[in-house]
């Protein structure tokens, strides 16, 4: 008979047991469930709610079970439904009637809320560390490439010259914000719900603050309905994970393009590429492509939980059992993605000569040419028009701006002088952009220094 089966006259159908059971996936919460139960039993004994001798037996029994879980010695059972009932059943089998007192003042509703909050805190912490590792890799690459000229793009068209360091620091800022989002998700999860009961608290004099202290929570929930009814803290994790995967996917898209023969900006390390079963010459950026593909999977996990929660009346509903698989899948996908991406990034070879050559084409210095005229007193809109005409002329003549003679330039506007040629070199175009956040090497160095301080 089920632990809750007192009011039922027959056992649940086997089909229901199979459909209803969550032990296949919530066994992942075993350590959190047992640790939470140890804290709960400790508090019950301290408060005199159950005999201290029974509390001691429960704690000792749970610690033995926890050790067996870590050693892989436990077999979970579908007919016990979930991790909570599996642990309680096993405990009672091992220590006898004292185990029946464990659930005093507690419901599975607040118990599972506790478990997933504890797991979410761990997930946020590990993700934060992985992002820190990625941020350090970006800083290292940026530091080594302060003067590596490359084209910046808009609409995937060459736009203006920048540096590889500046490009890496753009992603640094994105992933730094991602880390901040996981820190915020941690704070949302760091609220202890035990004591909420099924929905209306309990008549027992529980010391909720003591349980929070034992489990390392900074505060307790302030409303028993809210304590069991919401999973917004998981949605915050899933949202942060989705945004982080989006940033990874964008980065991977660029690396995929850059590794192609059309760009040839990077060479993927052999350890992070694959071949073709039919084409002997192929070296495919499969790792980057898989991360890009798995991003949609994490989006799906977010939408799964949003959809589960959107129509639920207060308080707990069985629909909420569906939170865990989406959460676990997103966590696993993100962890694997961050781990392999950071390792891959550190092995990439950047072809600096190809990047520099690419920057010199496509009239990336056209804006600087217009700015040159502005410094000579020409209104910007007039300068813009003149340089546009110059570009059209160059296209007709198959020339770059720096290929034009001074006489040719002056035929478009008399403000051009001999110093224009120094101003239009790729390095000069970059070095003149010396406001905070711009690509001039000394400005990027300031960003790198600030980034290291932020870590």
Show the residue positions of the predicted features.
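Glycine-rich cofactor/substrate-binding loops
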Residues: 1-36, 97-98, 279-455
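Short, well-ordered beta-strand elements within core beta-sheets of diverse protein domains
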Residues: 42-50, 119, 166, 235-243, ...
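Generic, well-ordered alpha-helical scaffold segments in large soluble proteins
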Residues: 40, 61-68, 90, 94, ...
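Short runs of predominantly hydrophobic/aromatic residues within well-ordered alpha helices
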Residues: 37, 84, 88, 234-237, ...
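A helix-coil-helix interface module used to build multimeric assemblies
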Residues: 1-201, 206-208, 212, 274-275, ...
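Conserved hydrophobic residue
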Residues: 49-50, 74, 263-264, 379, ...
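Charged, flexible cofactor/metal-binding loops and thiol motifs
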Residues: 116-117, 121-124, 128, 143, ...
């Amino acid at each position: 008979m089920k632990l809750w089966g007192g009011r039922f006259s027959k056992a649940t159908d086997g089909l229901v047991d199979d459909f209803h059971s969550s032990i296949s996936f919530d066994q992942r919460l075993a350590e959190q469930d047992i640790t939470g139960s140890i804290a709960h039993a400790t508090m019950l004994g301290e408060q005199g709610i159950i005999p201290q001798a029974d509390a001691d037996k429960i704690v000792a029994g749970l610690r033995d079970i926890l050790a067996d879980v870590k050693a892989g010695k436990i077999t979970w059972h579908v007919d016990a439904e979930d991790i909570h009932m599996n642990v309680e059943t096993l405990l009672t089998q091992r220590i006898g009637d004292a185990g029946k007192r464990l659930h005093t003042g507690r419901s599975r509703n607040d118990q599972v809320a506790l478990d997933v909050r504890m797991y979410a805190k761990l997930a946020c912490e590990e993700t934060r560390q992985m992002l820190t590792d990625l941020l350090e890799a970006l800083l290292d690459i940026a530091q080594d490439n302060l003067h590596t000229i490359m084209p910046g793009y808009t609409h995937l068209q060459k736009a203006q010259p920048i540096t590889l360091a500046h490009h890496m620091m753009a992603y640094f800022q994105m992933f730094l914000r991602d880390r901040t989002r996981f820190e915020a998700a941690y704070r949302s999860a760091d609220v202890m719900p035990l004591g909420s009961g099924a929905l209306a608290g309990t008549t027992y004099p529980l010391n909720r603050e003591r349980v929070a202290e034992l489990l390392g929570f900074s505060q307790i929930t302030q409303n028993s309905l809210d304590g069991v009814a919401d999973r917004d803290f998981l949605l915050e994790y899933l949202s942060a994970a989705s945004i982080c995967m989006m940033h990874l996917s964008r980065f991977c898209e660029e690396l995929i393009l850059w590794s192609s023969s059309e760009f040839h900006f990077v060479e993927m390390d052999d350890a992070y590429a694959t071949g073709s079963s039919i084409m002997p010459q192929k070296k495919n950026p499969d790792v980057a492509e898989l991360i890009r593909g798995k991003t949609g999977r994490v989006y799906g996990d977010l939408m799964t939980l949003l959809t589960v929660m959107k129509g639920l009346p207060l308080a707990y509903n069985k629909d909420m059992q569906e939170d865990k698989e989406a959460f676990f899948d997103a966590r696993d996908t993100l962890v694997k993605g961050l781990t392999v991406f950071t390792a891959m990034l550190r092995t990439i070879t950047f072809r600096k000569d190809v990047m520099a050559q690419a920057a010199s084409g496509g009239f990336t210095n056209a804006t600087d040419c217009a700015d040159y005229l502005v410094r000579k007193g020409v209104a910007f809109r007039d300068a813009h028009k003149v340089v546009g005409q110059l570009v059209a002329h160059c296209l007709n003549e198959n020339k770059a701006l720096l290929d034009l003679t001074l006489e040719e330039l002056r035929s478009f506007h008399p403000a051009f002088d001999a110093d224009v040629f120094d101003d239009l070199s790729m390095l000069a175009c970059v070095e003149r952009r010396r406001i905070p956040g711009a690509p001039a090497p000394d400005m990027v160095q300031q960003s790198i220094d600030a980034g290291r301080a932020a870590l």
